[in-house]
């Protein structure tokens, strides 16, 4: 499925008055809603830049080829180790750190970035697969507004999953709490409200919207956030600056062609080499 298919699916869901709730669960977290509200209501002034992190260890390390059971097909082996293949997981930026990308898009009122550049690669040798273990992306919006995402999955490193928003009147943080400060760094607000389970809130609001005849449709922002992550991955893999339109109209096919044959030979691209891997 390509971006145009998803966009069309969202359109059809709206026409049929169907609910479409995305997996961007933090949008249903009370504390996140409150702090993003501060970013968007003028409390910290005009937003000039944001920085989001998802620094953690490997999610599902690729096992050695010697552990592969005799007779197991390529597709089964890849499916069982799905995280390590771009065509199955999207890479760490699009699978795990996509939640941080969604935070960035939330702060930017879900407006697509105009362009991005990225650096990344695989620092620690893997037993197989073709995903990076780190990538950093710099996005740009009109007026010189910037968004920066840092993602890493390497054992033994500092871990963090935070978000920092810099405004003309102050700053907002998701880092050991949810709060704002003035330009001097003095705290001006801290979230101290209820913290119900965001997954439960997500389901409660979904069901309530259906019963009320006004089904929630998160489709547009789901597509935009996911595409922003894919755009960052493309920029990281190729080493090129990419525009939103380039990414949206990419002709790249990352899924193998012979997926109908469970026992067939499956070839996947090698690990991307920035500057050599071409944008398609």
Walk through the language-model features, giving the residues of each.
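Short, small-residue-biased leader/transition segments that mark boundaries at the very start
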Residues: 1-3
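C-terminal helical cap and adjacent loop that interface with cofactors, partners, or active-site loops
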Residues: 76, 89, 95, 99-113, ...
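Phosphate/diphosphate-binding loops
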Residues: 147, 155
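Active-site beta-strand termini and strand-to-loop segments that position acidic
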Residues: 138-143, 166-168
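Short catalytic-loop micro-motif centered on adjacent basic/acidic residues
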Residues: 20-23, 148, 218-219
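Catalytic-core regions built around general acid/base machinery
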Residues: 5-13
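Predominantly a Rossmann-like dinucleotide-binding segment in NAD(P)-dependent oxidoreductases
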Residues: 14-22, 26-129, 162-164, 171, ...
């Amino acid at each position: 499925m390509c971006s145009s298919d998803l966009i069309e699916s969202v359109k059809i869901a709206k026409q049929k008055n169907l609910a479409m709730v995305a997996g961007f669960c933090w949008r249903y977290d009370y504390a996140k809603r409150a702090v993003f509200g501060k970013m968007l209501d003028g409390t910290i002034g005009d937003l000039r830049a944001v920085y989001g992190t998802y620094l953690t260890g490997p999610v599902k390390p690729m096992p050695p080829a010697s552990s592969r059971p005799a007779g197991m097909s390529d597709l089964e082996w890849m499916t069982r180790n799905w995280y390590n293949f771009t065509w199955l997981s999207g890479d760490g930026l699009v699978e795990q750190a996509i939640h941080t990308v969604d935070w960035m898009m939330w702060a930017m009122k879900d407006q697509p970035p105009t362009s991005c550049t990225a650096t990344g690669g695989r620092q620690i040798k893997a037993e197989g697969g073709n995903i990076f273990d780190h990538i950093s992306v710099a996005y740009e919006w009109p007026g010189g507004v910037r968004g920066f995402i840092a993602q890493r999955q390497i054992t033994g490193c500092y871990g963090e999953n935070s978000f920092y928003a810099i405004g003309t009147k102050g700053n907002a943080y998701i880092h050991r709490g949810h709060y704002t400060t003035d330009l001097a760094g003095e705290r001006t607000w801290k979230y101290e409200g209820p913290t119900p389970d965001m997954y439960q809130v997500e389901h409660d609001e979904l069901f309530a919207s259906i019963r009320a005849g006004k089904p929630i449709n998160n489709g547009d922002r789901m597509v935009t956030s996911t595409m922003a992550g894919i755009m960052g991955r493309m920029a990281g893999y190729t080493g090129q600056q990419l525009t939103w339109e380039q990414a949206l109209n990419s002709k790249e096919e990352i899924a193998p062609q012979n997926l109908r044959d469970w026992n067939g030979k499956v070839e996947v691209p090698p690990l991307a080499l920035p500057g050599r891997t071409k944008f398609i």
